[in-house]
Amino acid sequence: MTGGETPPFSLAVIADAHFHDIAGDYGLPGVPAGERRLTLYSWARTRESTRVFNESAAALSAALEQVAARGIRHVVLLGDYTDDGQRRTTESLARLLTRQEEEHGLRFYALPGNHDVFGPFGRHRSGDFLRADGRSVLVTSDGREPPPGAVVTPDFRCEGLPAGLLPMARFGYFRRPEFLHWETPFGLNDAPEARSYEAVSADGRTRHRLMDASYLVEPEDGLWLMMIDANVFEPRNGVFKPRSKRAFIDSTAAGWNAMLRLKPFILTWMADVAARAKATGKTLLTFSHYPVIDPLDDREGYEPRLFPGGTILKRRPEPAVAEAVSKAGIDLHFSGHWHVAGQSRRGDLVNVAVPSLCGYPPGFCVVEAKGVAVAVETVDLSALPLDADIMALYGREAARTGGGSDAVSGARDYGEFLRLHTQALVRHRYFPREWPAEVVSAIEGMRLSDLLADERTRPAGDVPPGCDADEAVIALIADWYCLRQGGALALAGLGERRIALLEQLARLYAETPEASTDRAIAAYLGLFFRAGLFHLERARGPAWPAA
């Protein structure tokens, strides 16, 4: 950069913070921990969720500390900034962000994810929280038929649009005097009633006016942030009570596939914004919660063969999405939702998948941009310390319930904790929901030496000496998931020995026929470990820009 050149714009992008206020008041007294009383989700609930709950607030605070220390002022919140859109949680987050504005001069630009709002009317939410004795108690906003002992509070309800945005109003959703420019797909009016569109069910029988929360903001001269509300709450076929959550299809799996059908006006607006940005020399960055290209870049089709009913397949954007977004003049898009770190390309369009703060691997992105020149750095938060009180309470819960703590209480840092959480997910979520039952039954308690010797599971080729490590198979499967989600970040997190073991297994199973019927379990494992080799090659690829 010469002395007369202006520096590039800098901003941080934080996805899927899933903020839960561990000091929040949800109608129960909380668990004593030193001088604190903590409102904590149970470990039994956490190990079945793709995110951790009780560590989210500390991770967000640490991320914002790093942002401020780097001298970055602008922060994009890429959706799912709350735990589950609960009223009290959203209000607590808004207070935290306001303090960050006042103390560090940060400015936040939010867009909604599927966990932040629901349709026009909202929905009830529930969660299992710890008691002091290690048992759990249900907290719910639904008071219709609560189970005995449940805590019922309206503060746990997830709001709809626009009510769910109002606590976060100052963070981009509505105009602020200091913005150099601000608009929506509907014009310059920021009133919710001026930002609605008609959503129609597939059978044409149900119609709703829904708010779209998209906006374009110019926070400093020359920088345009296009914030896309890619939540789609499609009315269901049939007739429902107007305020029933069953009246709308959940936005979780809809994403951009549904955007093309139900919100095509967004693509028209995007094209107009992109053309104006080019004509006026603005640096345009585009964001939405949902990816426009498969973040795993699974061109070989491993996911549909391994997990045909899995969530990844349901959420994958169709090729038409990338075509439409690229046609609108967008060549760079940032997404969250999948809790994946990495990038994927289709033609000139690049999708940057920003990792979650509360899933493996934990991190956020720092972007430097000027014109068409963009640099993206992914900041790894694995080295963050753990809250000793929370770890001790997980141990107390395990001792009380006999359910085990999945070894997380022995984690040395946040990254190791999330890796062990991934291993718990394999046992408590992925195995029962996505894996063939006969495969799980065969391998669940195996060591690697068993896997390579058992007639049902051994690879087709000869096993070389020294490959019978005394490693739990479930730990290796968890490593596979960490590699899939983490890409390059997982290489350092898993370490050379574990990466080498995964690579060796993939090559051992390379000769196992996928279509084998007499050894179907081995065939499935062969496909699984070959997919791991694909994820490994992707992780070792160029970090930026996409090839």
Model-derived regions: residue spans:
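Acidic/histidine-rich helix-loop elements
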Residues: 18-58, 125, 131, 234-259, ...
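N-terminal active-site segment of His-dependent metallophosphoesterases
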Residues: 1-90
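Conserved beta-sheet core of the metallophosphoesterase superfamily
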Residues: 110, 302-378
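Active-site-proximal segments of metal-dependent phosphoesterases and phosphodiesterases across multiple
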Residues: 46-49, 248-270, 277-331
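Non-catalytic terminal accessory segments
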Residues: 1-9, 267, 276, 299, ...
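Active-site-proximal beta-strand elements of phosphoester/diester hydrolases
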Residues: 8-21, 223-232, 236, 350-355, ...
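Extended active-site neighborhood of metal-dependent phosphoesterases/phosphodiesterases
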Residues: 92-261, 265-268
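Active-site environment of divalent metal-dependent phosphoester hydrolases
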Residues: 20-21, 83-85, 114-121, 233-236, ...
